[in-house]
């Protein structure tokens, strides 16, 4: 269960203000959460005013500009810049999304950027994903089969069976959905959350997997699965347009069928 008493250093204070010295054609203020555990200080919100006429169109472009030209200590994850790797997931203007595909022009007023909520912060905009990945490992995300591996071909799958994986395999494990889920906020130590459960259903739905029963038994738990209350935050925030709530519903239906319900 989540700890309800906030530690003293959880209070976010006003930080430094940075402004470009040259005249700006399209000035824009970006407020960024800053936290360094090595400094033993409270988190702060630093303000950066940049010229949008001299940067790219996405939030990640602005962050890179700030890091390269204003404050090299700003810390965040990024890699592909194409919405594929999930590294740059963060909370932007109150919504969990990917910085690399979030247009600056979609946001009115000051831009507010925080790390993904309800995760320990490693530094600045970098969340600790260790627990999330441990939960992913727990569902055994690989084909489990007792049949021998074909000697001269892959494990074949019909087009119809392959289509059952659409809307599942595209998940990039960015954790935007799980960290937008109130049930995961309060029970993240036991509840697997929408991202991991969508991944679990991806293997349950795979016709090449022979361990559907075993997988369903592992998920049939008051906390692992049934903390989902169909709030739908996960589906609303997914940057890939997936529907984790639907996948969770299908898992629940399969378990009910096993019990003749």
Swiss-Prot record:
Binding site for [3Fe-4S] cluster: 181, 228, 234
Sequence positions that bind a ubiquinone: 186
Binding site for [2Fe-2S] cluster: 80, 85, 100
SUPFAM superfamilies: 2Fe-2S ferredoxin-like, alpha-helical ferredoxin
Assembly and interaction partners: Part of an enzyme complex containing four subunits: a flavoprotein, an iron-sulfur, cytochrome b-556, and a hydrophobic anchor protein.
Cofactor details (free text): Binds 1 [2Fe-2S] cluster. Binds 1 [3Fe-4S] cluster.
PANTHER family to which the protein is assigned, alphabetical: SUCCINATE DEHYDROGENASE [UBIQUINONE] IRON-SULFUR SUBUNIT, MITOCHONDRIAL, SUCCINATE DEHYDROGENASE IRON-SULFUR PROTEIN
Family membership: Belongs to the succinate dehydrogenase/fumarate reductase iron-sulfur protein family.
Catalyzed chemical reaction(s): a quinone + succinate = fumarate + a quinol
Keyword field: 2Fe-2S, 3Fe-4S, 4Fe-4S, Electron transport, Iron, Iron-sulfur, Metal-binding, Oxidoreductase, Transport, Tricarboxylic acid cycle
Keyword Isomerase: no
EC number: 1.3.5.1
Gene: sdhB
GO molecular function: 2 iron, 2 sulfur cluster binding; 3 iron, 4 sulfur cluster binding; 4 iron, 4 sulfur cluster binding; electron transfer activity; metal ion binding; succinate dehydrogenase (quinone) activity
Keyword 4Fe-4S: yes
Protein name, UniProt field: Succinate dehydrogenase iron-sulfur subunit
Pfam family, one: Fer2_3
Cofactor (UniProt): [2Fe-2S] cluster; [3Fe-4S] cluster; [4Fe-4S] cluster
Limits of the 2Fe-2S ferredoxin-type domain: 28-119
Residue numbers spanned by region Disordered: 1-22
Residues the record lists as binding [4Fe-4S] cluster: 171, 174, 177, 238
UniProt pathway: Carbohydrate metabolism; tricarboxylic acid cycle; fumarate from succinate (bacterial route): step 1/1
Top-level taxon of the source organism: Bacteria
Organism of provenance: Rickettsia conorii (strain ATCC VR-613 / Malish 7)
Signal peptide from the UniProt entry: none
């Amino acid at each position: 269960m989540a700890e309800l008493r906030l530690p003293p250093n959880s209070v976010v204070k006003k930080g430094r203000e940075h402004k470009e010295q040259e005249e700006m054609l399209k000035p824009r203020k970006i407020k960024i959460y800053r936290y360094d555990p090595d400094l033993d200080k409270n988190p702060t919100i630093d303000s950066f005013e940049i010229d949008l006429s001299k940067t790219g169109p996405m939030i990640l472009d602005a962050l890179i500009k700030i890091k390269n030209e204003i404050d090299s200590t700003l810390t965040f994850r990024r890699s592909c810049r194409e919405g594929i790797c999930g590294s740059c997931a963060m909370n932007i203007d109150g919504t969990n999304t990917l910085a690399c595909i979030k247009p600056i022009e979609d946001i009115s007023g000051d831009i507010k950027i925080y790390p993904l909520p309800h995760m320990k912060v490693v530094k600045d905009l970098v969340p600790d994903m260790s627990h999330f990945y441990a939960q992913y490992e727990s569902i055994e995300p690989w084909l489990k089969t007792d049949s021998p591996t074909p000697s001269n071909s892959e494990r074949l799958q019909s087009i119809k069976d392959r289509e059952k994986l659409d809307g599942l395999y595209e998940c990039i494990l960015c954790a935007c959905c799980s960290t937008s889920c109130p049930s995961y906020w309060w029970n993240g130590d036991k509840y697997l959350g929408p991202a991991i459960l969508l991944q679990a259903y991806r293997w349950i739905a795979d016709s090449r997997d022979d361990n559907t029963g075993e997988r369903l038994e592992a998920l049939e738990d008051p906390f692992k699965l049934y903390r989902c209350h169909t709030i739908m935050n996960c589906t609303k925030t997914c940057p890939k347009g997936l529907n984790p709530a639907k996948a969770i519903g299908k898992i629940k239906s399969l378990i009910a069928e096993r019990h003749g319900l």
